[in-house]
Amino acid sequence: MNSGICPKCGLPKELCICEEVAKEQQRISVKVSKRRYGKEVTVVDGLDPYEIDLEDLSKFLKGRLACGGTVKENSIELQGNHRDRVKALLTSRGYSLENIN
């Protein structure tokens, strides 16, 4: 399989808009939960792992927020309370603010 071609639409990766369309259809929830020893974790949920590269988005968020994090069960977990900054970063990345809770 040629890695330069999108498996969904069959267009070259440079012309593919599958991810842009997927961004408009996502219903994303950003919430903060407490974990062991009172540590806070920001959880970004509602992303479709088949249409959005969660590892790439996680790497972007961790780099911009200067925090640790992981991808678990189709959600992104970031160490610390970053709810407002995550919403701003997601909108700068092309996600609609109306679809982010």
UniProtKB/Swiss-Prot annotation:
Record has Manganese as a keyword: no
Phylogenetic placement of the source organism: Archaea, Methanobacteriati, Methanobacteriota, Stenosarchaea group, Methanomicrobia
Keywords: Protein biosynthesis, Translation regulation
Family: Belongs to the SUI1 family.
Record-linked Pfam families: SUI1 (PF01253)
Highest taxon, organism lineage: Archaea
Molecular function, one GO term: translation initiation factor activity
Gene Ontology terms: biological process: formation of translation preinitiation complex; regulation of translation; translation reinitiation
Species for this entry: Methanocorpusculum labreanum (strain ATCC 43576 / DSM 4855 / Z)
InterPro entries linked to this entry: DENR/SUI1_TIF (IPR050318), SUI1 (IPR001950), SUI1_arc (IPR022851), SUI1_arc_bac (IPR005872), SUI1_dom_sf (IPR036877)
SUPFAM superfamilies from the UniProt entry: eIF1-like (SSF55159)
Protein name: Protein translation factor SUI1 homolog
